[in-house]
Structure formats: structure tokens, C-alpha cells
Amino acid sequence: MASQGTKRSYEQMETGGERQNATEIRASVGRMVGGIGRFYVQMCTELKLNDHEGRLIQNSITIERMVLSAFDERRNKYLEEHPSAGKDPKKTGGPIYRRRDGKWMRELILHDKEEIRRIWRQANNGEDATAGLTHMMIWHSNLNDTTYQRTRALVRTGMDPRMCSLMQGSTLPRRSGAAGAAVKGVGTMVMELIRMIKRGINDRNFWRGENGRRTRIAYERMCNILKGKFQTAAQRAMMDQVREGRNPGNAEIEDLIFLARSALILRGSVAHKSCLPACVYGLAVASGYDFEKEGYSLVGIDPFKLLQNSQIFSLIRPKENPAHKSQLVWMACHSAAFEDLRVSNFIRGTKVIPRGQLATRGVQIASNENMETIDSSTLELRSRYWAIRTRSGGNTSQQRASAGQISVQPTFSVQRNLPFERATIMAAFTGNTEGRTSDMRTEIIRMMENARSEDVSFQGRGVFELSDEKATNPIVPSFDMSNEGSYFFGDNAEEFDS
């Protein structure tokens, strides 16, 4: 990207910092995850969780959700102004699982939000540490991306369900800041904008008055975020058109859907970072590891090393396969839901299979599920190699891709051809190049038609041995390109119900 000099790295966005050198970034990211770890250890004490229970990913998720809810100011304000029966606006909670007489028991707990905020601040040197909160949101978002398909949401906004590789971060809350915006896929931004435009079409006061002015500012800001994800001039010019639209309506929606489709071949830059469950950081802190002193990076070897020696567990339903549950969580930890399975396969060193073939449902257990039959097993989150996470979409090449998901969004900076189904994608671009964006549309279609299969993405980038911490000897894997590479291939994953 040409503008690299003016961009903050997303490690800096993550920690809310201004420009820092590499050592300072590593220290501030370390401070952030260390704070999450200290908070987790304290919460385990508070809830009297023993070591085994503290390593349970379901307990980790409940604790993460409690602190996120305690700091959700908008929702807290709303709850206080609209008291609903049976909901205490000052309390938050969820299911905590304990081991009793060889069985797992569910206990629904409630805690004062004020108390949780106090514990969180105390673990973070008295600060609000919003970066740490965002980090947990991104972990939840990555878990959702890996677990659910967003077919219904795509169809509702007039997009094609096969565009699911563009939907990274689609369940991230609006309040996730710059770090959240960096990990949102092109499709996610398009969907948010289309929802906004549709509200404007249905509600004539949406863009009017003082509120409307704020809405307009938010609209333009979202347009700029999306524009920044595109790597070609024509796509960016088209985003300027959408942003400057006097009265955003169907023309803008058409343009946005066109742009989303174009991103299947002319990929956008979407950041990827390995965000781990709080219990993993907690385990390291409890064992005396000093994240701030040692430094930490979300895009390098550190998360791989951390997972190499963390033993965490998950509850397993009767018909679920523990190895499949492990794959689900491994992919979520590395934000690899839309990565080419062949790449994930190579890095993980064990077979990574498409979502539809996984005998596992989501990680969380519903409150009406019977605990009698529920067991637990160790999650296998180790890897054979590590690779640097990417923030670019890579350049594009022509390859066979699948019926269910027709493109990938790379997570790891590893040399490969990027598969996409040109015939399927181009079929969506029939005819409609008239109107105010006609020259840009023509240019974008021309670029898509010229994307060649010989082009290899991430030239010379490879994976590294776990002993190679400085990334000195890249191993460039060779992939069998005749095989299927999409995770949501012709798939029947459950829908995410927001």
C-alpha cells in the first residue's frame, strides 16, 4: 500500500497508541494481554473456580462476556431507562460450569457490573483499558466467523450467500473502534452501509435534523473505512461516489453490491490477528509470565508459542468429535475462518476440514441443554509451523474454487495462488455498466477479467519452524491446487442469529 507511512499499524490501533517503534508496540500489546490475564486470574478467585474449571473455554467466554457487558455504556444506559421485567440493569452474569462428583454442573451466576469494572481496572493499572475489551470482542467475533455462516444476513441485504469470505467481523459490535474496523471484511462494511441506506429509504427523518447530521457523519466515516480497504483506484473512486451521494438510495446500494462482488477477485485489505480466550492469557500470568516485559505481538509467533503450551478444555456434547471442536477453536484463535484450508492445513500440521464435515456445534452450551450427558476434553491448539498474519488481501490469481464459498480471504502471509471461481463471479456482472459509475465499473470488470492464474500472492513468504522466532528461514509450501480450499464449501453450518 502506497500510504504505508501515514498508517498506524493495527497493533497501534489495538492499543490506542500513537506511532511507536516495534519495541514499544510489543510492550503495549503485552500490557494489554497481560491485563486480560490478570483480570481472568482475579475473576477465577472471585468465583472460586479451581484450576481445571478456570481452563474451561466456556467459563472463559462467560467471564469475557460479563466484563464486555459491564463496560457496554450504551446498553447499560438503555437498560436503566427501559427497565424490563426480571432484568437487573446493574448486574451481569452467565453460566459457570463446575466439576462435581465426576459430572459437570451448570450454575447461573450474577455479579454487580460495578464490581466487575473495579476488578478489570485494578488488573489494568487503574485504567479502562478499552484496547483489552476490544481484543476480547475480536476473539468472540473470530469464533462466530468460524462457527456460523451468515447466509441469511447476506440474502437480507441483497448480497449473494457465496460471498461469505467477505464477512469477517460481521458480529463485531459497533463500539469496537479502529482495531475492530481493521478486521472487518469488505462484505461486513457493505452490509452495515446497506442497512443504513435502507433505514434512510424507509424513514424520511433518518438523514434530517441534528440526529441526521450525526448519522451522515457516521455514514461517511464508514464509507472511508471501506474505501481504505480497497487496493485499486477504480474501487476507491466508486466509494467516493457512494460517500458523496446527496441522498443515499438504491443507486448506492447497487454500487456497494457491485463493489462487494468485485472484492471476490480484487481483494480488500483486511487485518488478521490472533486473539486468544482470556483463560489462555490467565494461565500464562498465573505461571509468572510477564507479558509487558517480554513483549507480545498478535501477528507474529507469540500466539503460536502461547498455544503450544496451554492446556485448555472444552465441554463436549454426546455426538460431537473433540478433534473437530479443537479445529473450530484453533481456526478462531488465528482468525482463519476464510483462509484457504490448504494453508491452514500445512501450518497446523493436522488435517483441517470444511465446516460442513465437522461433527461439532458452537462452543457455547445453551441453558436448556442437558448437562447430564456432557463431558469435557482437551482442546488441541498446537501447530506444526507458524506464519505471519496478513493485513492485505494479496494479489489475485485464477484458480478452481468451490460451490459454497467462491473465494478466500488470506489470513497468513504465505506464498500461494489465491483460488476463486471466475466464471461464477463474472456471471454476476452481466450487462449493468451504465449510470454514473459506468467508467469505474468497466475498469473494475476489466481488471477482474485480467486477473491471471500465474500470479502468485505473497511472493517468497512462507511458514516458519516454531524454533525460528526471528522468521529467518521461510519454508514455502507447495499446495495441491486440484483440491478444494474453502471452509464453507457447499455448506450447512448453522446460521448466526443476532
From Swiss-Prot:
Post-translational modifications reported in the UniProt record: Late in virus-infected cells, may be cleaved from a 56-kDa protein to a 53-kDa protein by a cellular caspase. This cleavage might be a marker for the onset of apoptosis in infected cells or have a specific function in virus host interaction.
Main location class: virion
Record keywords, A-Z: Capsid protein, Helical capsid protein, Host nucleus, Host-virus interaction, Ribonucleoprotein, RNA-binding, Viral nucleoprotein, Viral penetration into host nucleus, Virion, Virus entry into host cell
One GO term of the biological process aspect: symbiont entry into host cell
Unconventional nuclear localization signal (motif): residue ranges: 1-18
Positions of transmembrane segments: none
Location in the cell: Virion; Host nucleus
InterPro entries assigned to the protein according to its UniProt record, in alphabetical order: Flu_NP
A single MF term (Gene Ontology): structural molecule activity
Pfam families for the chain: Flu_NP (PF00506)
GO cellular component labels: helical viral capsid; host cell; host cell nucleus; ribonucleoprotein complex; viral nucleocapsid
Motif window: Bipartite nuclear localization signal: 198-216
Region feature Disordered, mapped onto this chain: 1-21
Role summary: Encapsidates the negative strand viral RNA, protecting it from nucleases. The encapsidated genomic RNA is termed the ribonucleoprotein (RNP) and serves as template for transcription and replication. The RNP needs to be localized in the host nucleus to start an infectious cycle, but is too large to diffuse through the nuclear pore complex. NP comprises at least 2 nuclear localization signals that are responsible for the active RNP import into the nucleus through cellular importin alpha/beta pathway.
Family recorded in the similarity comment: Belongs to the influenza viruses nucleoprotein family.
Quaternary structure and interacting proteins, as annotated: Homomultimerizes to form the nucleocapsid. May bind host exportin-1/XPO1. Binds to viral genomic RNA. Protein-RNA contacts are mediated by a combination of electrostatic interactions between positively charged residues and the phosphate backbone and planar interactions between aromatic side chains and bases.
The protein, known as: Nucleoprotein
Native organism: Influenza A virus (strain A/Equine/London/1416/1973 H7N7)
Designated gene of the protein: NP
